[in-house]
């Protein structure tokens, strides 16, 4: 009889346990990717069977072929208590819904060709993890910092949300989209411990510093002026390199139907494609998607958990209606001697 009661209780508790554990996936490794020569692998994992906050881990073997797992980046260490109460941009929420992603913290990442640099977002902030090796033991080392945080804070309307960041294969740049603009981040030098970089004074204008004083030379290159002890290190810099109209024909941003650098609804929901731009292997070219949803019907969706919130309109195709008009464009990028973005040298529509 006791065994029967145990089975009955287990069946009754199954829906709750399934929900609390994200279908029994919490605490299990996922999103694994081999890096470098294939002897190491990155993966995501939370700390327990009901912990939703996933961290970035590294799987590796030492010289005696013993296996190890090292945590590289922990959202709770980077953000503290706010890692458990996410503030996710609307477009990112939509992507996660289509990908059936219910986790928090680091839910996706992008790694360069050598497997030395990894980028990801937490709570809409952009982070970089660098992976190294201990010279004495050969064990992996890591350090993590936020990328271009001053830029995001200076003009959030321009530079956010940070969606779908992808690091270049050469590890020198990060590309992300706001939905309206493709943003390219020049990765600066790593600050000395206890000496965070400061963005030089001056107003931001589409990724270029202006109205700076004479001592702040070469700001368009992201440099500080020369001092007695030599050049100061390069800082992070964000530039909008391509965009679509942020307003409709009547000047109303709420009704704008164009997006750039994102996958249209059908691609995510039916094709499991969530990327809307791609780096070339040599990091010199970018292929990106832009699309117009003007011909798709609008659906108004309410949030049962927040009945005081007004229903939001979203354009979704349905049977016998039009899909979005999708376009592909390839651009060629130019960089200076410091690997800083210097402009677009060519572009072509390919579809």
Per-segment meaning from a language model:
Residues 1-351:
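Beta-propeller folds
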